[in-house]
């Protein structure tokens, strides 16, 4: 899939800095959970989920940042994409979010979390390009 087929939804400020104008980035200063909700809304509009919303080894409650790749164009509702994002939202609801505690005690960890999220997204973009 070329860049014209992908859109990144993120709350990570590093992502729009790292991607050029050929990439469509939907950046908002929102919570991790709100990113997933925004992705779910786009899936209901007919976009496809192109990266897993719970990718990586950092638990959702331990990082404030999330980037998810979806198709740029909408089609009909994809039940598999919807099932995956709804499962991710249910999983997140089980966690008590700890990331705000890091802000007070270790603000430098937020840069680390941004980099981890960016690396996961970069890998997803590269994998999608192989399709």
Model features per residue range: what roles?
Residues 1-5:
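Short, small-residue-biased leader/transition segments that mark boundaries at the very start
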Residues 6-8, 47-49, 67:
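Structural motif
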Residues 9, 26, 69-71:
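Residues in well-ordered beta-strands of folded domains
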Residues 9-16:
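Short, polar loop motifs at secondary-structure junctions
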Residues 17-22:
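Short, aromatic/basic amphipathic alpha-helical patches
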Residues 23-63:
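Rossmann-like NAD(P)(H) cofactor-binding subdomain of soluble oxidoreductases
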Residues 34, 41-42, 71-131:
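Internal alpha-helical scaffold of NAD(P)-dependent oxidoreductase catalytic cores
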Residues 61-74:
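Short basic, glycine-rich beta-strand/loop surfaces that mediate nucleic-acid
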